[in-house]
Amino acid sequence: MSHAVKIYDTCIGCTQCVRACPLDVLEMVPWDGHKSGQIAASPRTEDCVGCKRCETACPTHFLSIRVYLGDETTRSMGLAY
């Protein structure tokens, strides 16, 4: 089942989510528009198993990264009609 990983602009570039992910779904990418110079990205969401360790590790308390599991993806992201 496919999961969506959404990185929000409240990401502080701390790398905690990247280090917490057991399957390397996340990585840090350069971003000039951020004071840390980097932001989390999720290029390999097809490998996400939905463990949500990235959410738990985030020091912004789920404000920067969210994992939407399978069926809840469109509903939770506000995409359902």
Curated annotation (Swiss-Prot):
GO terms for cellular component: photosystem I; plasma membrane-derived thylakoid membrane. It catalyses: reduced [plastocyanin] + hnu + oxidized [2Fe-2S]-[ferredoxin] = oxidized [plastocyanin] + reduced [2Fe-2S]-[ferredoxin]. Pfam families: Fer4_7 (PF12838). Binds 2 [4Fe-4S] clusters. Cluster 2 is most probably the spectroscopically characterized electron acceptor FA and cluster 1 is most probably FB. Keywords: 4Fe-4S, Electron transport, Iron, Iron-sulfur, Membrane, Metal-binding, Oxidoreductase, Photosynthesis, Photosystem I, Repeat, Thylakoid, Transport. Coiled coil: none annotated. InterPro entries: 4Fe4S_Fe-S-bd (IPR017896), 4Fe4S_Fe_S_CS (IPR017900), PSI_iron-sulfur_center (IPR050157), PSI_PsaC (IPR017491). GO terms for biological process: photosynthetic electron transport in photosystem I. [4Fe-4S] cluster 2 binds at residues 21, 48, 51, 54. Its cofactor is [4Fe-4S] cluster. NCBIfam families: PS_I_psaC. Apoprotein for the two 4Fe-4S centers FA and FB of photosystem I (PSI); essential for photochemical activity. FB is the terminal electron acceptor of PSI, donating electrons to ferredoxin. The C-terminus interacts with PsaA/B/D and helps assemble the protein into the PSI complex. Required for binding of PsaD and PsaE to PSI. PSI is a plastocyanin/cytochrome c6-ferredoxin oxidoreductase, converting photonic excitation into a charge separation, which transfers an electron from the donor P700 chlorophyll pair to the spectroscopically characterized acceptors A0, A1, FX, FA and FB in turn. This is Photosystem I iron-sulfur center. It comes from Prochlorococcus marinus (strain MIT 9313). The gene is psaC.
